[in-house]
């Protein structure tokens, strides 16, 4: 966000959201403008609410897919509507997809960047969630689409990168193995797998509490 925002610039952020996104926008001098993710509509983004909150100061839109904290997985149709809005208003798209490999019940995860080759998208992921090794603080961002639209942003990223003297070399050393080796995460998200069974247990336990419903 520091590479993108000037004081007073606005970024559309989902509500509810992973709070680090709101914090990042604020610390960079921007204003986080929250758009509704509606519980009554499977926690999907309210497209009309997004449209209403765009101003001449809006620089980008953040999506979290799969969403933290709601757990919603956005279908292709919803993502396409977001792309259409971003295209109309020339917005950058920041897509937090760190849970993209932890999708269960045969649902499909669609990366929004695949629907927006003409826009400038920044997609985020990392080993802590995708490979369930949270102790290794290593992640990445993928810049895709029309790089000309993100020229100033890319220059800002390069400047900020040059200010960092030390990377997490021990963690970086395992990236190749994690991405190219045996993908054990698939065993965790099917019936009998630890993540799947934990989800089932928590879902039942929450719904057994009077006045509480989990979806």
Give the label of every model feature segment.
Residues 33, 38-105:
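Active-site phosphate-binding strand-loop segment of PLP-dependent enzymes
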């Amino acid at each position: 966000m520091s590479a993108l925002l000037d004081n007073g610039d606005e970024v559309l952020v989902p509500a509810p959201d992973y709070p680090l996104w709101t914090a990042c926008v604020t610390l960079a001098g921007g204003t986080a403008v929250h758009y509704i993710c509606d519980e009554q509509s499977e926690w999907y983004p309210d497209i009309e609410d997004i449209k209403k909150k765009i101003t001449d100061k809006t620089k980008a839109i953040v999506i979290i897919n799969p969403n933290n904290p709601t757990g919603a997985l956005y279908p292709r149709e919803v993502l396409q509507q977001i792309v259409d809005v971003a295209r109309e208003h020339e917005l950058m798209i920041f897509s937090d997809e760190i849970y993209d490999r932890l999708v269960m019940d045969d649902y499909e995860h669609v990366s929004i960047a695949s629907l927006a080759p003409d826009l400038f998208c920044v997609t985020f992921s990392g080993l802590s969630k995708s490979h369930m090794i949270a102790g290794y603080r290593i992640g990445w961002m993928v810049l895709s689409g029309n790089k000309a639209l993100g020229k100033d942003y890319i220059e800002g990223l390069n400047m900020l990168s040059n200010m960092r003297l030390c990377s997490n070399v021990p963690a970086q050393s395992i990236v190749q193995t994690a991405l190219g080796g045996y993908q054990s995460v698939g065993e965790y998200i099917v019936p009998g797998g630890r993540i799947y069974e934990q989800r089932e247990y928590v879902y039942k336990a929450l719904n057994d509490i009077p006045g509480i419903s989990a979806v």
